Amino acid sequence: MSTHPIRRGWTVVAAGLERWLGLDLVLLVSRIGIAAVFFQSGRTKVEGWLTVTGTAVGLFRDEYRLPLLDPTLAAHAAAYAEHLFPLLLALGLCTRFAALALLGMTAVIEIFVYPDAWPTHLSWAAPLLLLAARGSGRFSLDRAMALP
């Protein structure tokens, strides 16, 4: 069975990329990249290490207005989650859990806060779904500790 030279050439290139990049590198970059997005967001909600600001509480009260949640509680939960889960992702520890938690947070933001920002939220969901489905990869504490 003969194949077209372009197809054969592309198959060689694709195989080389797969060997050179590998899924483990893709998972590492996904973990670090999405962790940075959420960690930076968390830093905007606090002063010092983890003191939630009045501005953050005000945003949850006046702009975000999440249903069923007290704004002070929501601001604290978001600030702490945006520090803890990115740290877990960066370390590759409890990766699937952290990815699902941030995916849930993304869904809440999309549904209740900024429904028109779906392109941004989709760009967050993509690496989070990859990490939830495939785990943290070889360069992680999950792997070092033989966690799934």
Give the residues covered by each predicted segment.
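Interfacial juxtamembrane loops and adjacent helix segments
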Residues: 56, 60-61
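Extended, low-polarity transmembrane helix blocks
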Residues: 1-54, 66-84, 88-148
